[in-house]
Structure formats: C-alpha cells, structure tokens
C-alpha cells in the first residue's frame, strides 16, 4: 500500500487488535538482518518500543490536535518491557591506555577532546559546538539538549590538555573562527570526525571499538564520578540530564558541588600531557 492511497477512513478502520498483530509481527516475524543467508527474526524490545511510540504520537495528533478521530486505539497499549543492562564504560586502566595511545598530527587536539569527554562527560554534539569563548579557567560552558546552558567543571589535568592545544588552535583560521576544535579542512570539527578520532584512539589502545564509543566515554565519566563518591543528583547536573533515570527528577546543584564533582572524578588525575611536550605536530 502506498501512503498516497491511505485516507482517513483507512486509519479509522484500524483497531487495537490490528496494532497487537503488528507488534506481534515485530516481535516474532520481522527479519533483523534480511540480507543475511541465515536471517534472525524478532526485533528488540527497545526497537518495538520506539515504533509503538511513533504510532502513539500519530494517533494522539489525530485525536487531540486535528480531531479527525474520536477514539485512540493505542492509548492504553503498554510498551514492551525493556531489558535493563548496565552501560558499558572504561576502567581506569583502559582510560589511561586510551589517553596514552593518542598520537599523530592532531595529537594535542585529540588528547584535549578525550580529556573533555572523560572529565566532563559531555555529549559529542556538545563538544563540537564548543567555542573558544566557552572555555573558562576551571570550567566550560555547554549548550545541551533543549538549548539549555550549564557549566561543567574540569580538573587540572584537563586544563593542561586544553592549554597544550590552544596555541595550535590559535594559529589556525577556521571558517567558523569561534570554534574550539577545528578539522583538517579548517571547518568546525564534525560529530563524524569526533567519532572517527575516538575509534582510532580506541584501536590504538587495543580496545574494542565496536563496544566503546564517544558516548561510552560519557558513561565512563559518570561511573567514575559515582565511584568517587559523588552524589547521583550532582552527576545528573554534570551530565545535563533532566532525569538521570526514569524516576529521578532534575535537581539543581550549587556550583561549588559541581567543582567538587570534577575533582572527585578519578579520571581528572590522569595526566600524560608530558609525552607531548617534545611533539610539535601541527593540526590539519
């Protein structure tokens, strides 16, 4: 059926049993890897939940916004139960290996980026949007989801990494000269480029780049802060989460506690910047 052939009457004729049938198909008969010689069937609960969420949003729009439907057949449908799993993160030893592995023409830039991920737990999108003016003596200004501003403190080792990188950055003229991190073509660094440099560093450190990513470095920062005794609500503020988990309500933490959180993160003590002192490789 083509979308252009679907009219409002077709949608009105769909009832809850049809949605149940679709969800059953997803759980049991939908091919996960259809191009494989031996495809597996049944997509994950998380994938089914995302599809049901889209359907719920569609019917809510038709019933509450456009008033084209009087009844919502999916209003009372429950989401699939999701398997709870602990997020993957690097150990202290793996984090040290990752930082020690950084090399190449962009060594100082890449080292500073990894230090910011491990110390501040920021998102990739937040990192690529950092400007020179967002860097303060002991913290960075971050614009997170929903265009919300927060300040995240970092430790002395992270400060040294940024200071080692800034002279190289200041020699470059970027198309967006506000950008803290630039690329080899003199543009603001992209999310894709950050993904590649993290993957490269993971491989050089002998770590599985299919299991770890920039987002896993965010998990690492959060885990290490918690293991260092930081209150979960403080970590929530550092990460810029409205909810640290599904039941946690966002709580504002005073800046002094955020600074303590930065120093309590064991990763803030890792410092391998001396290995770059004799390396004058230039950014590209």
Give, region by region, the residue ranges found by the protein language model:
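Conserved catalytic core of the tyrosine transesterase superfamily
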Residues: 1-284
